[in-house]
Amino acid sequence: MDHKPLLQERPPAYNLEAGQGDYACGAPGYGAIPSAPPPPPYPYLVTGIPTPHPRVYSIHSRTVTRYPANSIVVVGGCPVCRVGVLEDCFTFLGIFLAIILFPFGFICCFALRKRRCPNCGATFT
């Protein structure tokens, strides 16, 4: 395979002055979008008696509850030690019923679970 350059001629120079290239611009304004005419004046309604506006009453009641800025709420936090996060654990009876009564036993298993704090060891049903 020959390693010849693909381009035999040099590219044209880029120092063309304005209006000398192939795409010279025509007269100024040629091809420009014409400006839009001014909009027509609004029609005025002339009536002898002004129409009364309906009365609008707006009654707003807003209840604002402010919480202290320093409180941090932990969902699932232990109410005894306030440090640990409660974990779900299944009772022996719940696991036994899940095995014996297979499809419906899972309902018993989830109904008989305990929540336990790993920090203080407190259990909640």
Curated annotation (Swiss-Prot):
GO terms for molecular function: identical protein binding. It is found in: Lysosome membrane; Cytoplasm, Perinuclear region. Keywords: Cytoplasm, Lysosome, Membrane, Transmembrane, Transmembrane helix. Disulfide bonds: none annotated. It is a multi-pass membrane protein. It comes from the Eukaryota. GO terms for cellular component: lysosomal membrane; perinuclear region of cytoplasm. It holds the Pfam family BRI3. The chain crosses the membrane at residues 67-86, 92-112. Interacts with BRI3BP. Interacts with MGAT1 and IFITM3. Belongs to the BRI3 family. Participates in tumor necrosis factor-alpha (TNF)-induced cell death. May be a target of Wnt/beta-catenin signaling in the liver. This is Membrane protein BRI3. It comes from Cavia porcellus (Guinea pig). The gene is I3.
